[in-house]
Amino acid sequence: MKKDFASVTPAGKKTSVRWFIVFMLFLVTSINYADRATLSITGDSVQHDLGLDSVAMGYVFSAFGWAYVIGQLPGGWLLDRFGSKTIIALSIFFWSFFTLLQGAIGFFSAGTAIILLFALRFLVGLSEAPSFPGNGRVVASWFPSSERGTASAFFNSAQYFAIVIFSPLMGWLTHSFGWHSVFVVMGIAGILLAVIWLKTVYEPKKHPKVNEAELAYIEQGGGLISMDDSKSKQETESKWPYIKQLLTNRMLIGVYIAQYCITTLTYFFLTWFPVYLVQARGMSILEAGFVASLPALCGFAGGVLGGIVSDILLKKGRSLTFARKVPIIAGMLLSCSMIVCNYTDSAWLVVVIMSLAFFGKGFGALGWAVVSDTSPKECAGLSGGLFNTFGNIASITTPIIIGYIVNATGSFNGALVFVGANAIAAILSYLLLVGPIKRVVLKKQEQDPDQSLPV
């Protein structure tokens, strides 16, 4: 239903509701990543209380990743079928509820507690699966192409902001009240956020505060403001055959591989980094919680700056390919610096180097902007889910591989080399595989999908 905004907003002057929407995505992503990091902050205490070695801890860390990957395509389908607002709200509620329940595992015997912890981490991962594809859909519908880099980088930078804010808080809670309190506090915070999301977020054409000028600005700039119209939802049942087209597109294959490599860096910082500070650098859990926030602060700054730089390049007439690839490649080059930590005994120099590496990781984390730029209009949620599936295989492999490396060598040196090598692989993927970045146009299903897209 059309609205008359003339009495509320001056003619021709567009509202800025889209920036409130991305702020809400920022809050959701902050809680999302804080809940992922609960176990990494409490990890040393949990490992001690439950009697886990490094390999077993690696598998517990990976429980989230198994479910998160499994849930990506169903989550993407749900987003396309029922819309972003409803599915994201349910996602927030359930991952927060399962986080809350983890606070009770201390009441069980060690053997039972380990099984429950793995199961609850698995359910958190399954519940979080629609979140990032949903974020990508929301940005694609609320933002023109010229602002998507900034918008995507802003909500994506929340993963670092979450560590800056919540790592010290969770470290203090663990130190003062025990590790169980971390899960209780974070679970309650997420449930409250789910309610706020339902009360404040709408589709572009249904938002009570957006005006026609802003809608026109978004749509004329390439925003998909009708993405969640009822007609679009009716068509979602026929989208599954498009998966083959997405999986045979050379550009997308390169983006998927690079995202796996970049996510490897993410999960080192989300899982083993605080443990590394405690076990390899001799810090207390409280110190590690505060120290882990410093690289994360740099990652936050890098994340915001990377998106801004990308959009500035685009507005100055550079191609979309150039504007997206330059920050990604530059950021991954900086991330490789973490390997230098193997050659110093200074804990504070390690923090400085990791801060530089995390800044680079944030600066180059433009994958979701690329997804918004390239996803077919017919299946944006499914495309984002596929992208996140490949990327988050790293959430399974990274904690396990690092666990085996540490267990076999008694050192984190090999682990840092492994993570740094993934940054190099991401660069090579964007340089050699991705090619020009552009929106994928799908062939209709009655045509041969093998000939739909160049590889």
Swiss-Prot record:
Localization in the cell: Cell membrane
Which GO terms fall under molecular function for this chain's record? transmembrane transporter activity
Record-linked CDD domains: MFS_ExuT_GudP_like
Q: Which PROSITE patterns does the annotation name?
A: MFS
- For this UniProt entry, what is the primary localization, expressed as one broad class? membrane
Q: Report the catalytic activity.
A: galactarate(in) + H(+)(in) = galactarate(out) + H(+)(out); D-glucarate(in) + H(+)(in) = D-glucarate(out) + H(+)(out)
Q: Provide the transmembrane region boundaries.
A: 19-39, 59-79, 87-107, 108-128, 153-173, 177-197, 253-273, 289-309, 320-340, 348-368, 386-406, 414-434
Induction data: Induced in the presence of D-glucarate or D-galactarate.
Keywords of this protein's UniProt record, alphabetized? Cell membrane, Membrane, Transmembrane, Transmembrane helix, Transport
Which ranges of the sequence are coiled-coil?
A: none
Q: What is this protein called?
A: Probable galactarate/D-glucarate transporter GudP
**Primary gene name:** gudP
